[in-house]
């Protein structure tokens, strides 16, 4: 449910900015779905720089379900967030039946990373930065 997804992403650290119903042909011209009925919730990251739109379509009916596809599937099926305490967050996300896809892996002294299956089967990457070196710093060295 959309309420469950909002609660899940709130637990990760995002903030609900607002939610609303979007219906009709005009909105459907944006998505290419025609006469649609969808409830959206806009979540914002704690720094205010990024937003994540969650949606629940009532019409038209869903025609494909990719929730259990692996991380290398074609399409936009995953998102990653930097978090402060990965182990603590994983415990808090258990109430949403979130499961680590394989394991938490540490990359040097820089990051601890994992993918989880969250609400509605969403594939979410979680990254805990361990030191002051950022992903950009690492990429610049290469």
Question: Predicted regions span which residues?
Answer:
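Conserved short histidine dyad/triad with adjacent acidic residue
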Residues: 61
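Core segments of cupin and vicinal oxygen chelate
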Residues: 1-49, 95, 114
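Short, solvent-exposed beta-strand edge segments and adjacent coil->beta transition regions
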Residues: 38, 74-78
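Non-DNA-binding regulatory cores of transcription-related proteins
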Residues: 69-73
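Vicinal oxygen chelate
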Residues: 19-21, 39-42, 50-52, 65, ...
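Localized edge beta-strand/strand-to-loop motifs within extracellular or lumenal beta-rich domains
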Residues: 1, 84-85
